[in-house]
Regions:
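The feature marks the mature, well-folded catalytic cores of soluble enzymes
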Residues: 6-126
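Short, small-residue-biased leader/transition segments that mark boundaries at the very start
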Residues: 1-5
Length: 126
C-alpha cells in the first residue's frame, strides 16, 4: 500500500488560471488518510510554465511532469524545454523511484494532442 501522493501545483503564480484549483486540491489532500487512518505524504510537483501554441486547437497545452511513466526498470519523465523546471521535476520524481534508469522525452508533441506517455499507455494489470 502506498502512502505517497503526487499533486501538481503552479509555481506560486497567483495569476495563473490553474493556481486556484491546484491550491484547493492541495488543501483537500492535507487531511487525506489511508484506510488504516495513516496520514498520506503529499509530494509537491511543480507545473511547467504555460505552453501556448499559436493557432492550435488547444489554447494552452496540458503539460505536466506528473505524466511520467514507469516501464520495467525505467523511469520516463516528460520535459518541456524549461531547463530549471525540468531539472527540479526530474530530481523530485527520481527521489521517489531510486535505482530506476531515468529517460526523458520531449513532452510537447504529446501534449499537443491532449496527453503524454502515461495517458496513451493504456495501463493494464497482469
Amino acid at each position: 500500500p502506498y502512502t505517497t501522493l503526487f499533486r501538481s501545483m503552479v509555481e506560486s503564480k497567483e495569476t495563473d488560471e490553474n493556481y486556484k484549483v491546484l491550491k484547493e486540491n492541495r488543501e483537500r489532500l492535507q487531511d487525506l488518510r489511508t484506510v488504516k487512518g495513516e496520514k498520506v505524504e503529499v509530494i509537491e510537483l511543480e507545473m511547467p510554465n504555460a505552453i501556448e501554441v499559436k493557432d492550435w486547437r488547444l489554447p494552452r497545452l496540458p503539460a505536466s511532469y506528473a505524466n511520467f511513466m514507469l516501464i520495467n526498470n525505467g523511469l520516463f519523465i516528460p520535459t518541456f524545454k524549461q531547463k530549471k523546471k525540468d531539472a527540479i521535476a526530474e530530481e523530485v520524481i527520481c527521489e521517489l523511484f531510486p535505482g530506476r534508469e531515468l529517460m526523458t522525452y520531449d513532452g510537447k508533441d504529446f501534449v499537443m494532442e491532449g496527453g503524454a506517455l502515461h495517458c496513451i499507455s493504456m495501463h493494464q494489470p497482469k
